[in-house]
């Protein structure tokens, strides 16, 4: 299948903590990704993130999930989003299930 690719020209980083009785004070990062003012996806990182899958398409947006330790690497790729060439991508297996997803930078 052809990969789903969403170009990014702007992003917002949210850093926070999730507190509940079972696992207090778990950190997370959410990066909302936009293209021409419309949200095209999000990247969630952290030990509070427990998705059923690590990449998906939801309501026309690419959603990616990573361990918090990957934040510096992902943020480094996102630097320069306003100058173009940055995109979220998602590849699926022959059954249409997400298999690979990430952030790419073209130069």
Task: List the predicted regions and their residue ranges.
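Short linear motifs at secondary-structure transitions and domain/linker junctions
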Residues: 1-9, 60-64, 107
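OB-fold ssDNA-binding interfaces and closely related basic DNA-contact patches used
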Residues: 1-45
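Residue-level marker of intrinsically disordered, low-complexity segments enriched
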Residues: 6, 16, 29, 41, ...
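Intrinsically disordered, low-complexity, compositionally biased regions/tails
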Residues: 20, 41, 45, 50, ...
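Generic structural motif
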Residues: 34-38, 48, 91-93, 106
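Acidic, aromatic-enriched beta-alpha/helix-loop junctions
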Residues: 38-75
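Short, compact, well-ordered microdomains
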Residues: 65-107
């Amino acid at each position: 299948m052809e990969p789903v690719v969403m170009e990014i020209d702007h992003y917002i980083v949210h850093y926070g903590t999730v507190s509940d009785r079972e696992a207090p004070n778990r950190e997370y990062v959410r990066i909302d990704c936009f293209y021409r003012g419309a949200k095209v996806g999000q990247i969630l990182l952290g030990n509070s993130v427990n998705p059923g899958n690590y990449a998906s398409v939801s309501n026309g947006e690419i959603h990616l999930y990573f361990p918090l330790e990957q934040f510096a690497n992902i943020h480094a790729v996102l630097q320069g989003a306003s100058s173009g060439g940055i995109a979220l991508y998602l590849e699926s297996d022959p059954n249409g299930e997400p298999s690979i997803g990430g952030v790419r930078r073209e130069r």
